[in-house]
């Protein structure tokens, strides 16, 4: 079982405290940066396809906007917490600052499981999230994006709702849109490729050739799939990937000593990156149970 006492936000604060000590940061700056500037907890009532009404909990955390509008994704996950969203918003502040992008850190989420929701129900959650937060987000304040179990389709629903509320065209409200609606080419691959490009530069510094490395990947969604593709292009070998099994409600690792076949695994995975373990065994993968 996972350790329920673990706090991502406490870990993020500890990381900040260590860095602040090294930098000799003054006390007022520390007190400001250790906590979010603003955070919102919302309730989203949705009429389900069967006629019942469910209320979904949602969040948006704006950690810091000193360098520009807050920026960060929206996560749909059944175990989403405000604590996790706080940590991710803080990390977004540091990531934008480190690469000198004039944006601050934000993050959002909804406690829900898209596996068990119809397209219409997911659309209503997206639109409800925007309606609740429309006065506190936008191109000059806070720009959302896709994240865990959200896609360009979710962003399009949110954009449409925001434009309906404001009564004007607002393409800068959200990123990760379909290319035909103002999205960016390469957005789908960017996060996974970026992770591997960072790894490539680190290996250069260490004098290690990618072809001499072996890796395991946690997750098999959009980010991991593109990261695995690029890592293998560089010559690296991936022996193991792990992902969540929705039916068993636990994670499994899929291992093959001589390296996985990415196209093969893509052929037996669902749209969320969940791998069919029976088919994986038939293809010669060792299936190892992980955390529930």
Q: Which residue ranges define each predicted feature?
A:
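Charged catalytic carboxylate motif
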Residues: 15, 84, 194
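A generic local secondary-structure boundary/capping motif
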Residues: 32, 43-45, 98-101, 146-147, ...
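Glycine-rich phosphate/diphosphate-binding loop of Rossmann-like nucleotide-binding domains
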Residues: 183-292
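Glycine/serine-rich phosphate-binding loop and adjoining beta1-alpha1 elements at the start
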Residues: 77, 97-211
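Glycine-rich, N-terminal phosphate-binding loop and its surrounding beta-alpha-beta segment
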Residues: 42-114
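Short, Gly/Pro- and small/polar-rich lid/capping loops
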Residues: 2-43
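Glycine-rich beta-alpha junction loops
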Residues: 36-37, 46-48, 62-65, 107-110, ...
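Structural signal for hydrophobic packing residues in well-ordered secondary-structure cores
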Residues: 16, 20-27, 89-96, 126-141, ...
């Amino acid at each position: 079982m996972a350790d329920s006492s673990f706090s991502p936000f406490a870990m993020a604060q500890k990381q900040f405290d260590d860095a602040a000590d090294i930098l000799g940061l003054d006390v007022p700056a520390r007190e400001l940066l250790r906590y979010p500037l603003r955070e919102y907890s919302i309730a989203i009532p949705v009429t389900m396809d069967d006629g019942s009404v469910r209320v979904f909990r949602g969040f948006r955390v704006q950690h810091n906007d000193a360098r520009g509008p807050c920026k960060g994704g929206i996560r749909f996950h059944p175990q989403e917490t405000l604590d996790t969203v706080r940590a991710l918003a803080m990390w977004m502040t540091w990531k934008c600052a480190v690469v000198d992008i004039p944006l601050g850190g934000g993050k959002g989420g909804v406690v829900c499981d898209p596996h068990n929701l119809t397209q219409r129900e997911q659309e209503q959650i997206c639109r409800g999230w925007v309606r609740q937060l429309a006065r506190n987000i936008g191109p000059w304040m806070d720009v959302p994006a896709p994240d865990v179990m959200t896609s360009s389709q979710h962003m399009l629903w949110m954009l449409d709702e925001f434009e309906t509320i404001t009564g004007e065209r607002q393409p800068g409200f959200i990123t990760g849109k379909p290319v035909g609606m103002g999205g960016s080419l390469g957005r789908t691959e960017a996060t996974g490729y970026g992770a591997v490009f960072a790894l490539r530069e680190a290996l250069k510094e260490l004098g290690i050739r990618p072809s001499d490395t072996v890796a395991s990947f946690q997750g098999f969604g959009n980010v991991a799939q593109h990261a695995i593709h690029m890592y293998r292009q560089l010559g690296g070998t991936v022996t193991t990937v792990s992902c969540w099994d929705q039916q068993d409600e636990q994670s499994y690792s899929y291992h093959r000593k001589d390296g996985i076949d990415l196209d093969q695994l893509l052929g037996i995975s669902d749209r969320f990156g969940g791998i069919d373990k029976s088919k994986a065994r038939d293809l010669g993968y060792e299936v190892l149970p992980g955390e529930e």
